[in-house]
């Protein structure tokens, strides 16, 4: 087993796979429910790997996926570097708070990259709360002429290894 890099030791409780239900809404689409799986891993370097995918709760059709990395450049700071197969990349930066069995991350996009065919996403922000074996998050999005606002929320549980 590769040792965890000391820079990301505060994020060690994230390691593993998390799964559970979520719900989404946005003014330009119908509300929806989904099932999500997130896996956090590491390779011994100063970042976590991140892989996420969702499927529709009603019929299991694939909905979304993203991959990336999480870095801790300072004890109270966190950076997310993500790529979406829909032609979107995002760099999010924000705060990291670790205390006991609780981790809180609040990040906001500082850079969003779009391919020519990607949806016009102009703003993204995420809030993560991890307590023991429960991970909750919300995601806000500004896109297609709409201001930054609530888009997604989910509660995931750690899955057995």
UniProtKB/Swiss-Prot annotation:
Q: Which Pfam families match?
A: THAP4_heme-bd
Q: What class of enzyme is it?
A: isomerase
Cofactor notes? Binds 1 heme b group per subunit, that coordinates a highly solvent-exposed Fe(III) atom.
Catalyzed reactions per annotation: peroxynitrite = nitrate
**Pathway recorded for this protein:** Nitrogen metabolism
Residues engaged in binding heme b: 151
Q: What is its EC number?
A: 5.99.-.-
InterPro entries documented for this protein: Calycin, Nb(III)_bact/plant, Nitrobindin, PeroxynitIsom, THAP4-like_heme-bd
Name the domain of life this protein comes from: Bacteria
Placement of sequence motif GXWXGXG:
16-22
Give the signal peptide range.
none
Which keywords describe this protein according to UniProt?
Heme, Iron, Isomerase, Metal-binding
Assembly, in brief, is: Homodimer.
Entry's family note: Belongs to the nitrobindin family.
UniProt-listed HAMAP family: nitrobindin
Query: What's this chain's function?
Result: Heme-binding protein able to scavenge peroxynitrite and to protect free L-tyrosine against peroxynitrite-mediated nitration, by acting as a peroxynitrite isomerase that converts peroxynitrite to nitrate. Therefore, this protein likely plays a role in peroxynitrite sensing and in the detoxification of reactive nitrogen and oxygen species (RNS and ROS, respectively). Is able to bind nitric oxide (NO) in vitro, but may act as a sensor of peroxynitrite levels in vivo.
Provide the protein name.
Peroxynitrite isomerase 1
Give the species. Answer: Mycolicibacterium smegmatis (strain ATCC 700084 / mc(2)155) (Mycobacterium smegmatis)
């Amino acid at each position: 087993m590769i040792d965890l890099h000391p820079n990301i030791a505060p994020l060690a409780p994230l390691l593993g796979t998390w799964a559970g239900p979520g719900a989404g809404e946005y003014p330009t689409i119908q509300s929806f429910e989904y099932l999500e799986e997130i896996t956090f891993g590491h390779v011994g370097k100063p970042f976590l790997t991140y892989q996420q995918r969702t499927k529709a709760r009603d019929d299991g059709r694939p909905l979304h996926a993203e991959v990336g990395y999480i870095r801790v450049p300072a004890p109270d700071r966190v950076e997310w570097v993500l790529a979406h197969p829909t032609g979107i990349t995002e760099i999010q930066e924000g705060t990291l708070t670790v205390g006991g069995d609780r981790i809180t991350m609040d990040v906001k996009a500082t850079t969003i990259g779009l391919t020519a065919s990607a949806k016009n996403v102009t703003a993204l922000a995420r809030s993560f709360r991890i307590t023991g074996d429960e991970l909750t998050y919300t995601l806000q999005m500004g896109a297609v002429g709409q201001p930054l606002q609530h888009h997604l929320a989910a509660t995931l549980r750690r899955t057995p290894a």
